[in-house]
């Protein structure tokens, strides 16, 4: 007796899925071409040369740094750790306090905006409420405004009643504090973070969310059980960008820190290392590489999430 295996119906790809597949294949071919590889190598070399020069200068003696260019090291190599010793152990530098301040500033300035942006992006993407589209356009438009334009009005809000925050500002004569720097970085980061995370959420299949709703899941459960696991690469990529932005920031720390050395990050101290006339920039080169340690560790630790986050949602049908 012969048994017949029933044929399994294979779903036909939709037009949107076919366009997305064709676009992905076209992008793959372009990025894997010899010309694309050559361009990537050229850009990498051009990007690396200044960093290499700074690295070599950080190990050169002071008189050679001031007397000749870093490229002369290849014909007359000489090494010294005196620059790093002066930066790390010098009585006038004291980088340890500023290093800790940078960590204290950076961590909340990354966690706060990403947490708020993730929840706001879900609301814009999957919740219906009056004025949703208009409000989202307003959030998108906020990216156009340069942060330098908003600094003076924002600083006025911090210190002026009835909307001011005297407890955060410290006193009538604004002295700055960690809270004002955290809040400022969060405000500046939210528009772009909401926009990027919203676009990623919109790429999640509607069927997945509808199936969860059929099973009785509410918005909180859908957000926690479905969205967050799928968004891990995008959140990590955005977190790296925000971390690097805050860690390397000087302007926001100077303006909203109020010149208070107790809350000044490492970048403020690095700016002072070169001296009032830039005569000690050999110390600045060593201090710059000391400040690279934490960002380098963060990037290497989250590199795989960073690449996946950049590619997530990049091809739209």
Role assignments for model-derived ranges:
Residues 2-317:
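A hydrophobic, multi-pass inner-membrane permease signature
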């Amino acid at each position: 007796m012969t048994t017949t295996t029933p044929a399994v119906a294979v779903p036909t790809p939709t037009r949107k899925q076919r366009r997305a597949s064709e676009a992905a294949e076209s992008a793959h071919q372009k990025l894997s071409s010899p010309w694309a590889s050559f361009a990537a190598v050229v850009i990498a070399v051009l990007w690396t040369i200044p960093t290499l020069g700074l690295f070599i200068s950080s190990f050169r003696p002071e008189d050679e740094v001031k007397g000749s260019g870093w490229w002369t090291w290849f014909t007359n190599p000489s090494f010294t750790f005196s620059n790093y010793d002066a930066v790390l152990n010098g009585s006038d530098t004291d980088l340890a306090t500023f290093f800790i301040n940078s960590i204290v500033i950076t961590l909340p300035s990354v966690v706060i905006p990403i947490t708020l942006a993730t929840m706001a992006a879900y609301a814009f993407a999957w919740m219906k409420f009056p004025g949703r589209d208009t409000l989202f356009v307003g959030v998108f438009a906020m990216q156009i405004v340069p942060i330098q334009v908003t600094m003076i009005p924002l600083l006025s809000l911090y210190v002026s009643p009835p909307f001011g925050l005297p407890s955060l500002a410290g006193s009538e004569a604004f002295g700055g504090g960690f809270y004002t720097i955290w809040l400022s970085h969060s405000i500046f980061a939210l528009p772009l973070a909401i926009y990027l995370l919203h676009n990623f959420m919109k790429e999640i299949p509607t069927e997945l969310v509808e199936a969860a709703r059929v099973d009785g899941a509410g918005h909180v459960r859908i957000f926690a059980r479905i969205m967050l696991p799928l968004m891990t690469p995008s959140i990590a990529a955005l977190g790296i960008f925000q971390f690097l932005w805050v860690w390397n920031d000087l302007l926001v720390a100077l303006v909203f820190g109020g010149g208070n050395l107790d809350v000044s990050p490492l970048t403020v101290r690095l700016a002072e290392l070169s001296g009032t006339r830039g005569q000690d920039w050999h110390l600045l080169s060593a201090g710059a590489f000391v400040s690279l340690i934490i960002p380098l560790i963060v990037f290497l630790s989250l590199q795989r999430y960073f690449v996946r986050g950049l590619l997530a949602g990049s091809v739209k049908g």
